[in-house]
């Protein structure tokens, strides 16, 4: 069966979907609260900085409605971009506590792979720390490019894609692969990068990134068993359970 449809069937089952309820609720709350206060705070700062009473070229330029509209639109786009992906990251982080259970259920249901020694918590935290260390300079570079239209969006897009891809892959592979197999994965296969890019684009839409996090995880779990361990799902077990 196609991995997409197999993942979609699992995604719609309550035994899996229940794990996404808490992460979706917290991520949505963060998006609404932080998004509102971030936009209004930055707008208030810009209005105060470019207030008409102050003298200077930038204050004069900001007094034009067209210029004010462009700056506030950029503010909305960048803040919206940041809040959407940050809320998705928080949702993904919460869901990561349930990913080992999700992977174990999928393995028991379809693949019957005998798990060996898993990654330890310390080793997993070290891998996450390495990802964050590489993400920080990318994020600061994006901040430097903040006031360059369109370039700022591309910079933030690439920086957060790096974090999204690596965090999602780490979350899934650490739950699926044993310690030895994990260390052998020096490079992520192109097929994984392609799908995480598609997931990242979907996550750029408000709410979609929150609701579909569980699907992303389930899909990559199936992909890992089939493309790394080269296992085929036992569909007879699947058919008998439906």
Question: What are these language model-derived features?
Answer:
Residues 7-25, 115-142, 168-173, 177-203:
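Interfacial aromatic "cap" segments that immediately flank transmembrane helices
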Residues 31, 72, 203-207:
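Membrane-embedded alpha-helical bundles that form the substrate/pore pathway
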Residues 73-104, 146-175, 207-231:
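Selective recognition of hydrophobic, aromatic-rich stretches within alpha-helical transmembrane segments
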